[in-house]
Amino acid sequence: MKVRRFLVNVVCAAVLASAGAAAHAHRFHAGITDISFNEHTGSTEVVHTYMAHDVEALLGNLYQRQFDLSDPEDQAVLRKYVEKQFWLAAKDGRRLPLKWVGLSVDVDSVTIFQEAPATPVDKVETIHDAVLVDFLPDQANTVNLTAGGSLRTFGFNARQSELSVH
């Protein structure tokens, strides 16, 4: 009987440890964006990557329904949100036009592709990145900007959503 009780306790401990590990597995909320110039197209390319769970939770919270990001109508909802929360501005303060190229979704991440057609990356003066910070107060977004052969990294969060690149 003692052996059986011991085994039950071990199994219960293992289950609880696993549940605790799963709960702690997603204790941070982060996104990463890469901005670079494509010499072949003459456009500045923007690639965002976010945790799929965070994007799904955001959309579900905003619209009180399930989202399927393989559905073009649901993609349009995400597009509208991202275009409101992320933008680039020129030296005169005007926003640079960002064209939505598309997105890729897998179990772990949502990758969003945008571009500023016929716009060199050195036209970017200001980056505004508030994606997910309105929903997740601890969201941290990192933007890597490659310009003139050098890489610069900028950090954004609920307290800092806009930075000059110079």
Task: Briefly describe each language-model feature range.
Residues 7, 22-24:
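Intrinsically disordered, low-complexity peptide-like regions
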Residues 18-20:
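N-terminal signal peptide c-region/cleavage motif recognized by signal peptidases
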Residues 24-166:
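N-terminal soluble domains immediately following signal/targeting peptides that reside
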